[in-house]
Amino acid sequence: MGQKDISEKILVDYNDVFADIMNVCIYNGKEIVKPDELENTFVHSQYKAEDGKLHEQERDVTKYWKKGETAIAIYGIENQIKVDKNMPFRMIGYDGAAYRGQLLDKRKSVVPVASFVLYFGTEERWNKYKSLKECIQIFEELDNYVNDYKIHVIEVAWLTDEQLKLCKSDFGIVANFFVQKRKNKEYEPDDPREIQHVDAVLKLLSVMTGDNKYETILYSEEGKVNTMCEVAERLVNKGIKQGIEQGIEQGILSTVSVLRKVGKTDDEIVELIIEEYKLEKEKVLDYLS
């Protein structure tokens, strides 16, 4: 992701997505949090992507949860692609800052702060480093006097089919993508649901997968995409074009592989290859064998 994208809004910052995450992952599908009850606070949410990677020096997204004009809680979400053994320390700092901010604002009543780690990793589960005491060595006689601090991790790639069905926002599309990627590293997008926040979804996929092919679709001359199926088709077309430009056998083999992954039949593949590469049918059939 380039410098010009640093201040752009991220997917989780949209209230419909944020509320969906809370309701599905925290409240077991009950519509406890409504999008119009959420209000941004404290930080301007952004990807810190100077080198294409996600850098988190500030809390990613923080929102007041309000009923009418009365705030009843503060929610915080941190995006992570890798397990971070220091996350409990970071979360203590974020939550402490949220409470301190309320005191500095001289609020009549301080509301609770609930923070969550949105973990997009697909290689391993977040099975450790979920509490302060896991991260430090404590003298046995001192243990009872050291307060523990636990963090709450939402493992996106391990959401169940039942949880995925409960999603009502673009979070469901993104979550399904990472669930399928965990099960099959070669998975190509095939979700037919319409994407509401196309720009934010594709940028999140690029950052969290480390592959900018999704973001480059935003700047293509072919226009906007509306579903992940269209994203896959656009990637196929891009592969064909690159194959033509390279004019090498590997380009054709790669195109055949991608077309098969998105469900094209051999007859359809033959027609596409003949049309784009201007080859004889017999030659094309050699690549399918």
Q: Where in the sequence are the language-model features?
A:
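A general recognition-element feature
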Residues: 1-242, 288-289
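Intrinsic-disorder/low-complexity detector
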Residues: 213-289
